[in-house]
Structure formats: C-alpha cells, structure tokens
Design a protein with these regions (language model features):
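Membrane-anchoring hydrophobic segments
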Residues: 1-79
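Residue-level signal for pocket-adjacent positions within structured domains
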Residues: 47, 57, 230, 271-273, ...
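A cytosolic-side transmembrane-helix exit/cap motif
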Residues: 52-56, 145-151, 175-184
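Extended boundary segments
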Residues: 19-26, 113, 156-181, 209-230
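Long, contiguous hydrophobic alpha-helical segments, chiefly transmembrane helices and signal peptides
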Residues: 39, 44-45, 56-57, 62, ...
C-alpha cells in the first residue's frame, strides 16, 4: 500500500490525541479533542504539500482523506454533548463559541454536498468559513479548559501542536497559497482548436516547469470574464520554458475557455502533480486512452521522437469528429516500429474490450480516460491475470473538489 505513510500520520495523530486526554484523566473530553485534531489534519491535507503528496501517493489520495477527516470531525462534533456527559464547564461565552462553530461546520458540510448546484467560485468562498468555525472551536476549547491546555504537559503540547498545524495550514490555504504556490508565470502563445470541443494551449513560462510524462498542473487564467480560481489540466508536452495543455469542453469553465480564451493572456501555474508516470513502468507497456485521456500520452510522444521500448497503444473514441492527434499518432507509428497503434472508433468497431487478453507480469498497463471505462477494463485484465500491473487515472470535479482517481493494482 503506497499511501501507508499518510495513513500512519492520521492513525498516530488519533491515537496520540486519545492517549493525551486519557492520561490527563479527562476521558469525557476525548471526542471533542479528537474533533480538533482531525480538523487540523483536514486543513493540513488541503495544502497540496509535496511531501504529503508522496506520503499519500498522490493528491487524489490526499483529497480522499481530507474528505474523510472532515466528515469524521463533523460526526465527532455532533457527538460532543453526549461525550461531555452534559457537563457545563467554562463560561457562557465559551459555550456559545462552541455552538457557533458546530453550526458553521454542519452548514458547510451541507453546502459541500450541494456544491454541484452552485457556482464553483461561490462554493469556494463559502467553504472558507470552515476556518472561522475552526477558530471558534479552538477558543471554545481553551476558554472551557482554563489553564489546563496552556501548561507544558503532554495534553497541552499535543493540543497546542495540532492547533498550530491547523491554524498555519488554514492561513496558508486561504491567504498565501494563491500567491506563493503559483510561481510559474507565463503567457499563452498559441490557441489551437483541435476539434469542435477540444483546445490546445501553448504557454511560454518565465521559468521551466519540471514535470514527468503523465502529470497535470493547476492553472490560473488572468483574462476578463474567467474565474480567478485555479483549475487542473493535463500536460500534453513541453520543453525548456514551453508547456502545452490540451483541454476538453466539459463544464462551464472549460466551455468558456474553449470559446473565449485569447492569445497573449497571462497565466500562472502551480507545480506538476500526479503519479501515473509513464517512465516508471516496466519495459513492455500497454497504453489505453479514452477521449481526452490521450493527453498524458501525447506528452510522452511529443518529447520522445524515438521510442526505445515496445508499446501497444489503444486510443478509444466515439466518431472521428471527437478524436484528436490522429495524424500525430499515425506519423509516430510510422517512424517507430515498436509503437503498435490501435485506433478504436466505437461507432465503427464497438467499445474497447480486453476479455481473455493474455497479459503477462512483465507488462505495465497505463490507462487514462472515463473512470467507468477504466474500471471495466481493469476488471477484464485482472480476470485473466490477478497480478496484472495496472496504473490508471481519470480526472473529475467531485462536488467541485478536484479528485484524481489513481489506482495501482
């Protein structure tokens, strides 16, 4: 399990919190104490920290556990009064701060689940009230406990440590991330519409973007009428200070981008993310792309004109009008005998099928495309070879939270 370090971080934090409250003889405060710790971890997991991304083996796993700790925190807060046994320690102000914090958290959870019905920018700002609720919760805890949490005991150190993590992480996310993380400034040099719904952007950056074939990055677009929030797009190539992104019209933002993006527009880019690294597979590889899922494979093809390994590439699409880069793929196959190209138009030959495919243990299968398609193909591969080396990713916005589905089987 590649995310074992990240899981261990959460588990150790929970166990340490339980032990700290129990050793202080305050077992009835364990549940609210755990809520503060898991809320701190919720903020920490939203920072997109590079080390944490490695520990969780991908930002997609970080978002999964971010959601888990957030929901777990709300459940703990809902049980707060029960765990306290109805005791009313501290001042009336402390109790009111705690109530306000809980109401805010519950409201924000409801907003998160209704997120698909409101604009992303509005959802994003509403979600920031979590930080305010967290501060109310900390004031509630410290006012309630008097000086117990301010002494250099195990309990005071543990609660203070996670409080600092939560406060610093939340402050960074809300006030610093947008300005500090997007260090790669650039300008759109070329807008190329590949078909009726897919556009390719060629961007010149002020400094080189370090990335690996198969990764994606968050991009901010500074053009009137566009959201200021960053959006994730797959990298489709680049060298030196040039980087390419290929984007499909699949929502409000990408539709506007396809219709109205202009050459000369300024952009800023965060670092590269993702763990579907084509260079990390075995010598023999099978690549499977569905629709816009071709993008990460194009990044490899563009920057490696001479293929030095056997690759069977299956590109699935529905109608030639929806396909992209067909000429590039055909030219690449003509120049590289080891590149076995299969173009699969579902209108002509039906959907891609790998039932009874003889997959050996010396081959890595990389897949990128619709999640349902990849899950189906993965099941087919595993039926013939339970030890199949499969790596697949698919990007979506789940309730406007960027989620990367990444599986290493």
């Amino acid at each position: 399990m590649k995310s074992i370090k990240g899981i261990a971080l959460i588990a150790v934090s929970i166990l340490l919190t339980i032990y700290a409250w129990a050793s202080a003889g305050m077992t009835n405060f364990i549940v609210p104490g755990l809520a503060l710790t898991t809320l701190s971890l919720t903020f920490l997991l939203a920072t997109r920290n590079a080390l944490l991304e490695k520990w969780f083996h991908g930002i997609e796993k970080m978002y999964t556990y971010h959601k888990f700790t957030a929901i777990f925190s709300v459940v703990l807060l809902a049980l707060h009064n029960v765990a306290m046994g109805g005791s009313l320690w501290g001042s009336h102000v402390a109790a009111q701060l705690g109530n306000v914090g809980i109401y805010l958290f519950v409201s924000i959870v409801l907003v998160a689940y209704l997120g698909k019905h409101i604009k992303y920018e509005a959802w994003r700002w509403i979600h920031r009230f979590v930080y305010l609720a967290y501060i109310f919760g900390l004031f509630h805890a410290y006012m309630l406990m008097g000086g117990r949490l301010l002494t250099p005991t195990l309990l005071g150190i543990v609660v203070g440590f996670y409080a600092i993590i939560g406060l610093v992480s939340g402050f960074y996310i809300i006030f610093l991330y947008q300005s500090l993380a997007f260090r790669h400034l650039g300008k759109i040099m070329q807008v190329k519409r590949l078909n009726h719904d897919t556009v390719e952007l060629k961007i010149q950056l002020s400094q080189k973007l370090d990335y690996q074939y198969g990764q994606f990055a968050f991009v901010k677009i500074f053009q009137e009428g566009f959201e200021k929030a960053p959006h994730p797009f797959s990298i489709s190539g680049g060298h030196d200070n040039i980087v390419y992104f290929t984007i499909k019209n699949s929502g409000d933002h990408t539709k506007k981008l396809y219709d109205k993006i202009q050459e000369g527009t300024k952009v800023s880019i965060d670092r590269a993310y993702g763990h579907m690294i084509l260079d990390q597979g075995q010598e023999k590889q099978i690549w499977i792309a569905g629709g816009i899922g071709i993008t990460p494979f194009i990044s490899y093809i563009r920057e490696n004109p001479n293929l030095n390994r056997p690759v069977s590439f299956y590109y699935a699409y529905t109608g030639a009008e929806n396909a992209v880069y067909l000429d590039l793929l055909k030219d690449y196959a003509a120049k590289n005998p080891q590149f076995d190209l299969h173009l699969v138009d579902s209108k002509v030959s039906g959907y891609l099928d790998f039932k009874n495919y003889p997959l050996d243990n010396q081959t890595t299968v990389f897949m990128c495309g619709p999640v349902k398609m990849m899950d189906k193909l993965a099941d087919e591969f595993k039926k013939t070879n339970p030890k199949a080396d499969l790596v697949y990713e698919g990007f979506k916005f789940g309730n406007y939270i960027p989620v990367y589905t990444n599986h290493k089987v």
